[in-house]
Each structure stands twice: as structure tokens, then as C-alpha cells.
């Protein structure tokens, strides 16, 4: 993105494994999401999905961290403290297990997730994705100003 973030999506799509929709339908949904991000000035670098059902007992289905491990390997980036946004408990659990900072958005299923409790430690909560983006950009500006202040010479 313009702000220097790499946006990656990790999504459970058991409907594919159950035969509710095919890969072409899923790709069309993903393209729609990418187009919406692009229209807002963002860019999704990659979309990772798990097509398995819970009974398949795979490593990639959230709340397991398999997709996150794949993302870390593919982008050659450790995920410690990387912000990870989701609206379900399993999103947050997978993020926490991978060492990310779990961020709950109250849009989508987020309000119900908050009501049900059991959030991972240090979960940060925002109203929506826009509020998350604003927070991250503000934090970056503060960190940049702090670095600039620390490198000034008298």
C-alpha cells in the first residue's frame, strides 16, 4: 500500500470443500474484494484460503496457524507483532498462535464475537477496518516522529 503495508488475506472457505460453490465463484468473490481495495487506494498482495471442512482436521483451517505459517514463509517475514484483523474468534486465535497482534473489528460478526468472550490476550478492538487503518497510520506517524527526534543532532 501507499503506507508501506503488505495486505494479505487468510480465509476459511469450507463451502468450497462442501461443494456449495466452485473455485470460479470463489475467485470471482476474491476479485471483487481486490477491486474494492484498489478503488480505495489499497492493494491485496495475496489471498490464502483453506477449502477444508472442520472434519478434515487440516493445519490450514483457522483457528490453527497453518495459513499464517505459509504466509510467513511465502513473504519471508516473521509475523511477530504483525497486525492481524478479523471478526471471528478463530481469526483472532490463529493470529495469536502465529505471534501476530490480534485485532477484532466489530463489523461483520465482530460484535457477536466480543459478546461471546474468550478473546486472546492483548486483542485490540476497533469499530471497523477503517478505524484499524487510521490507528495503524497514526501509530506509524508517532513512531516516525519519535525516530526523527532521536536522530537529531544538537
Where does each model-flagged region fall?
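Intrinsic-disorder-associated, low-complexity terminal segments enriched in Asp/Asn/His/Tyr and depleted
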Residues: 148-150
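Conserved Lys-Pro-Asp/Glu-containing loop-to-beta segment of HAD-superfamily phosphomonoesterases
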Residues: 59-92
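Acidic, Mg2+-coordinating phosphoryl-transfer loop and its flanking beta/alpha structural elements
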Residues: 84-124
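Short glycine/serine/threonine/alanine-rich loop segments
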Residues: 5, 42, 77, 100
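Short, hydrophobic alpha-helical segments
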Residues: 75, 133-143
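Substrate-recognition element of Asp-dependent hydrolases with the DxDx(T/V) motif
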Residues: 1-30, 43-56, 95
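Structural recognition of alpha->loop->beta junctions
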Residues: 29-46, 115-137
Amino acid at each position: 500500500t501507499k503506507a508501506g503495508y503488505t495486505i494479505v488475506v487468510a480465509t476459511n472457505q469450507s463451502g468450497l470443500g462442501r461443494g456449495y460453490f466452485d473455485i470460479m465463484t470463489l475467485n470471482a468473490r476474491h476479485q471483487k474484494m481486490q477491486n474494492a481495495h484498489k478503488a480505495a487506494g489499497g492493494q491485496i498482495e495475496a489471498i490464502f484460503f483453506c477449502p477444508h471442512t472442520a472434519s478434515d482436521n487440516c493445519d490450514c483451517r483457522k483457528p490453527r496457524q497453518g495459513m499464517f505459517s505459509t504466509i510467513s514463509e511465502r513473504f519471508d517475514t516473521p509475523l511477530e507483532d504483525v497486525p492481524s484483523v478479523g471478526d471471528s474468534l478463530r481469526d483472532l486465535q490463529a493470529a495469536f498462535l502465529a505471534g501476530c497482534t490480534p485485532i477484532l473489528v466489530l463489523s461483520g460478526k465482530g460484535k457477536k464475537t466480543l459478546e461471546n468472550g474468550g478473546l486472546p490476550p492483548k486483542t485490540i478492538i476497533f469499530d471497523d477496518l477503517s478505524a484499524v487503518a487510521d490507528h495503524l497510520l497514526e501509530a506509524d506517524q508517532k513512531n516516525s516522529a519519535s525516530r526523527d527526534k532521536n536522530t537529531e543532532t544538537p
